[in-house]
Amino acid sequence: MKFLFDLFPVILFFITFKIYGIYAATAVAIGATFAQIGWVWFRHGKVDTMLWVSLVLIVVFGSATLILQDETFIKWKPSVLYWLFAAALLIAQAIFKKNFIRTMMKEQLTLPEPVWARVNASWAAFFAFMGAANLYVAFNYSTETWVNFKLFGFMGLMLVFVVLQGLMLSKYMATDEDKEA
């Protein structure tokens, strides 16, 4: 359910685009992201940094799209977001010796430090790739194709990446039999 909630602005963007076009979809995405943050704040009393970053980007790039009536800006937003994620993962690891992936997953997995570093680097590389893929589709195909890719392509790529990551990490996961021994 959280997965769908996280996709709420993207799904509304997609539906609105199909009916009313890119500018209405952009306005709806801005409003939906504000609503999403309001709901998270109401339910949990705090909002993740990642969601705040997404809000700032959708407001900046979305507003530029609407004010200038130029869809180029909204097409850049996913790439900038993905590249910020990649940079945050790499900078936190290299400079601050903090592995955000380990912080998020340490309750589910116990891994040797070099493996955590590889997992962190693979997520950073994946986000960098996603940013590049977004720009490739955005500026080499129609806006309609880009909107479809933004929802279905990104979800598909994420699913494939998570499955591959799970396969890579499966040898480190303890089975119930291992835990009983």
Curated annotation (Swiss-Prot):
Lineage, broadest ranks: Bacteria, Pseudomonadati, Pseudomonadota, Betaproteobacteria, Nitrosomonadales
Top-level division of the source organism's lineage: Bacteria
Gene Ontology CC annotation, any one: plasma membrane
Location in the cell: Cell inner membrane
Record-annotated membrane-spanning stretches: 3-23, 49-69, 76-96, 119-139, 149-169
Primary localization class, coarse: membrane
InterPro entries: YciB (IPR006008)
Alphabetical UniProt keywords: Cell inner membrane, Cell membrane, Membrane, Transmembrane, Transmembrane helix
Keyword check for Transport: no
Protein name, as recorded: Inner membrane-spanning protein YciB
Family assignment from sequence similarity: Belongs to the YciB family.
UniProt membrane topology term: Multi-pass membrane protein
Keyword Membrane: yes
